[in-house]
Amino acid sequence: MGLSDGEWQLVLNVWGKVEADLAGHGQDILIRLFKGHPETLEKFDKFKHLKTEADMKASEDLKKHGNTVLTALGAILKKKGHHEAELKPLAQSHATKHKIPIKYLEFISEAIIHVLHSRHPAEFGADAQGAMNKALELFRKDIAAKYKELGFHG
């Protein structure tokens, strides 16, 4: 399940593009998530009122949350699988406070892959997509293990 050095390099190369506009990428990813899986919006009290894509695009709060999500994910990706310290508080909050099912993390992973491919087709070809998919799978597997430790089976 681990990634090779080359795969991590592909992940981090495209992540450099993401970091140039974390909030914009994050907002696009959350919009894709909410449009593709409307049930996920129910987990976000402060976004439930956003019914249309136009509402979502106009929301500074959504943009801010997108920035928060991708900042945390970037810190995890940069650890190249050695992300125990970064993962623990994230798993804690997502399991006990937010109660985010692992399935929703699969949904946001799909949204990440889609948005990165649409925004960076040259840097995010099949190899980079495969590497990012593996990195996100590793993240989900490890967070699922933490969820289990916390007694959350979402």
Curated annotation (Swiss-Prot):
Q: Name one Pfam family in it.
A: Globin
Residues modified as Phosphoserine are: 4
> Which Enzyme Commission number(s) are listed?
1.7.-.-, 1.11.1.-
Q: Where does heme b bind?
A: 94
| Keywords, sorted A to Z | Cytoplasm, Heme, Iron, Metal-binding, Muscle protein, Oxidoreductase, Oxygen transport, Phosphoprotein, Transport
**Ranges for domain Globin:** 2-148
Chain positions found as Phosphothreonine = 68
Q: Which InterPro entries match?
A: Globin, Globin-like_sf, Myoglobin
The record lists O2 as bound by 65
Name a GO molecular-function annotation: oxygen carrier activity
Q: Does the keyword field hold Manganese?
A: no
Reactions catalysed according to its record: Fe(III)-heme b-[protein] + nitric oxide + H2O = Fe(II)-heme b-[protein] + nitrite + 2 H(+); H2O2 + AH2 = A + 2 H2O
Q: Which BP terms does GO give this entry?
A: removal of superoxide radicals
Q: Which GO terms describe its cellular component?
A: extracellular exosome; sarcoplasm
Does the keyword section mention Lyase?
Answer: no
Where does it mainly reside?
cytoplasm
Tell me the residue numbers annotated for binding nitrite: 65
Q: Where in the cell is it found?
A: Cytoplasm, Sarcoplasm
Q: What does this gene product do? A: Monomeric heme protein which primary function is to store oxygen and facilitate its diffusion within muscle tissues. Reversibly binds oxygen through a pentacoordinated heme iron and enables its timely and efficient release as needed during periods of heightened demand. Depending on the oxidative conditions of tissues and cells, and in addition to its ability to bind oxygen, it also has a nitrite reductase activity whereby it regulates the production of bioactive nitric oxide.
Which family is this protein grouped under?
Answer: Belongs to the globin family.
Note the subunit structure: Monomeric.
The protein's name is Myoglobin
Natural source organism: Globicephala melas
